[in-house]
Amino acid sequence: SETFDKFCTILFKKALEKEIAAIGITDYFSIDNYKKVKAFISNIDTSTDFTKEEIITVKRILIIPNVELRILPVTDSGRLVNVHCLFNPAYEDSLENNFFGSIEYSAGLGKKYKMNRQGLIDLGKSLDSSLNNEKAYIKGVDSFVVTHSALQKLLDENSGFRENVIIAVSNSNRDGASAFQKHYDLFEDAKESSLDAVRKSIYCISNCI
C-alpha cells in the first residue's frame, strides 16, 4: 500500500467483506503498528472511504496487539522458533514496563540489551556504529532473540503479565516447535531426546498451537 492509511482501508474493507470480528496486529518486539491501526480507527469518522454503517461496524472489531518473538534454540531447518504474544488491549499501557523493558538479550561480555526501542537501537549500533537510530533499530529487531527461560521467568514472576497474555506457538516444521522432531534421526536408540524436552517446554508456556 502507498500509505498506512491506505493499508488500513484495505484491511477493514476486507474485514467487513468477510465479517471478521477480531484482528491481531503483528509486530516484532513492539506494538507500533497496533497503535497506528488504533489511531486510524479513532479518526475513521472523517474518512470518505466508509459508509456510516461500515464505520460503526469497524469500531466494533476487536483489535489485538500481537507481538511476535524469535525464541532460541534454532530448529533443524536453521530457523528460530516463532512465538506470538497476544495481549489484552486493556493491558497496553503496562507493556512498556512489564514486557518490553523486562526481557533482555545477552550479547556476552556483560552486555545486555532490553527489548524496548532504545535497547534495540543500542543493539543495532553495537553491531554497526555507523547506523542512524532508525536503521540501528531495524538492525536490532533483526538481531534480537529471546530465550525460552526469559519468557518462562516473566510468566512465573509477573501474574499481571500472565493474566493478560495468550501465547501461541507455531507448529510448523520450519519455524515452529515441531521442527525439533527431525533431530530424532540422530538418536536412533533414544526414546526421548533432550530436544523433545525443549519442544515440550515451549508447548508448556503456550496457550495455543
Q: PLM ranges: what are they?
A:
Residues 1-9, 13, 19, 39-43, ...:
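Domain-core and long-helix interface of multi-subunit machines
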Residues 1-126, 130:
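A metal-dependent hydrolase metal-coordination microenvironment
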